Amino acid sequence: NPDTIAELEKRLYTPLSNTLGAASCSGIFFGLNVTANTSLPNAEDFRAGLYLRYSGLQPTVASEQDVICFRGAAETARSLQLQMHNRWNPELNAALIPGSDQVTAYQGSRLADGCLWTKRTELPDTWEQVMLLCVPILDGGGTVRGFCGAEISDLYFSLSHNIVPSAFGNILTLAAPIDGDSLLLSGAMLGAADGSRLTANGILHISDGKYYTTYSDGKNTYLGRHQLLDSATWDGIPLAAVTLVPDGTFRSYEKGSQIAWFL
């Protein structure tokens, strides 16, 4: 019933909006195992729900950001006086969210065990790149009724993780899937990378050293460290927090230090 769905979305707007304002993310969403699009051939992929995002992100506090409706019933957006995204749709398409089927098939009782991240992926119907955290929604009896989660966009991550100047060179920050000895840049979120050649493409091969780790694609080399997180992507690859310094700037510092010591 579309009216019932819209009423439920309106009731859940306040906790969703409050979470968006308090959490470190660029969007927040939920999708229930129900749809108003029952006549469509792929109706099983659609989830009624609400997806709120920041629009025109600026390096400022959450309370000063504009919130728009990316997914949700038109009646919900109108009644809440929410601006609708120019790529708005009334429902979420679960088929376009990697791993959402695994989340909704979860049979445990501990929510943290049912959480999954996507790698860096294109937000449906937009040019933006995001990582999505998906969490199962359980009812009082422990049955999964859908999924909810948070979005981290590439712009949000970049604004939130600026370059950190140091004597060794500018320190860069990443959130990246690491598969064995390979850091998967194509699935990573990059902080501000001004002045470096680091892009979200390709693979950095990892070599452990005594004091630091080397990351290289054969042309560009970085020195740094990474810490595996208690999280994995939908296909089971661990996520890591990574800090890098371009090898060239570190070698310049090293050479300068040796000259100063000699003098």
Segment roles from a protein language model:
Residues N1-T104:
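Extracytoplasmic/periplasmic sensory segments of membrane signal-transduction proteins
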Residues G27-L40, V103-T121, I237, F250:
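Tryptophan-centric aromatic hotspots in well-structured domains and transmembrane helices
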Residues T35-N37, P124, I152-Y156:
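Solvent-exposed loop/turn segments at secondary-structure junctions
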Residues N37-P41, R110, P124-W127, D139-T143, ...:
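Short, solvent-exposed loop/turn segments that connect beta-strands within catalytic domains
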Residues V67-G149:
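Extracytoplasmic/periplasmic ligand-binding sensor regions of membrane-associated signaling proteins
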Residues T118-K119, L174-I178, D208-G209:
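Hydrophobic segments of polytopic membrane proteins
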Residues E128-M131, L138-D139, T143-G146, A150, ...:
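Extracellular/periplasmic juxtamembrane segments that couple receptor/chemosensory ectodomains to their
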